[in-house]
Amino acid sequence: MKIRTRYAPSPTGFLHIGGARTALFNYLFAKHHNGDFILRIEDSDNSRNIKDGEKSQIENLLWLGIIPDEKPGSETKFGPYRQSEKLERYQKLAQELIKKGFAYYAFDNQEELELQKKEQIAKGIFSFRYDQNWLKISDQEKQKRLKNKHFVIRFKVDKAKNFCWNDLVRGQICFEGSAISDWVIIKSDGFPTYNFAVVVDDFDMEISHIFRGEEHISNTPKQIGIYQAFNWKTPKFGHLTIITDKNGKKLSKRDKNLFQFIEDYKNQGYHSEAFFNFLALLGWTSPDSQEFFDHKSLIKAFDYKRLSKAPSYFDIEKLNWFSKSYISKMTVDKILENLELSDNQIWNRFFVETFQKSSIKYADFYKNFEFFHRPKQEMDEKMLEIFEKLDKKPVKIFASRIDYQNWDYTKINDLIKEIGQKLEITGKNLLLPIRLATTFTNSGPELARAIWLLGKKIIEKRLLKWK
């Protein structure tokens, strides 16, 4: 049997951290077993779909390096890969379930359903159980009501059964059929519900293994019931633990203190391979506690048995550490491929070399680029206050001896050292006066590099009064 896994998002939003991790674990499992990873789109709820939701899912998966073997647009026997293109298939199978006695029409309106719930609550039943009244009506009454076209189709749950599976992450899990209400498989608008469509899609696409979030545990017994009703082989399920913030709370899209979507990290310029690496360690550990992996080594090392049963903490500091480590190991040429700087390639290379070790993401390069590309016209009050208290001798000597004709980093650096030796000063006493006079700030990269990057025209203008 060929291993086939899937990631099946709804285009109701952009690619979330949790969804990306789910996709990654399914991808790694499939590739570890030389299988296929499928991307399909669960777009049956038109009211919640958003513009570019599907596009965001696909583009950001590709940015992460999670490459589907099949996706919308693929021409295979397993398609189509959008639920909206399979409505006839769902309707046909729902009718089969009715004929076999596993499903039935229900004609309740919303008021009647609310009344049922209130009556059950009054009896101390707080988990709603549908009363199956429509199973008792005559065929004549049923046909009459079907003409009004206001109905749903419900799955008839076998109350005497236990629905069990050996979860790939959590072990044996069971639900009593008596605790599961007869649930809707086809809504009044003719569209399938999630729990029905997902089973049909997984069967049609021959999905063998499914890793997904723990919020789907309660959906699993319903889905198993559909598999059993059709006598289809049930795939193996594994339910991943939640991802938490620093306070131990589940990541929430409403939390504005942490970026929730992959697009945000992409736009910030995080290293995609670093994010891929970091994401894999959110709920999985290698046998030897190794942390740095490239794609191939991660696929080779991935073992689902090492998926955690405990919540995973999204540590932004660790992500920053990963991204910084990856960027620091890149070639300058590779970094330049990801940046749009000046027209001067010599300047660009020197700039990247200057900030490579300190940059966490590509946005950091741009932030520093702005400092040199749009330099300050004057020193601000805070810096001026600091500067006025310093000895100006280093500045005066530097201004009188700097060689503008031969603008060279090494010569600038040597001159600073010579001034230190002449005045017998080092550190802050030597560097701070020159830094403030030339860069208008009291911090930054190595001083000689900062001066060279600002350029001789700007430096000459700033030092003119100190000659």
UniProtKB/Swiss-Prot annotation:
Protein name (Swiss-Prot/TrEMBL): Glutamate--tRNA ligase
Residues the record lists as binding ATP: K253
Predominant location category: cytoplasm
Localization terms from the record: Cytoplasm
Origin: domain of life: Bacteria
GO cellular component: cytosol
Chain positions of motif 'KMSKS' region: 250-254
Catalysed reactions, semicolon-separated: tRNA(Glu) + L-glutamate + ATP = L-glutamyl-tRNA(Glu) + AMP + diphosphate
Family: Belongs to the class-I aminoacyl-tRNA synthetase family. Glutamate--tRNA ligase type 1 subfamily.
Organism name: Mesomycoplasma hyopneumoniae (strain 7448)
Complexes and interactors: Monomer.
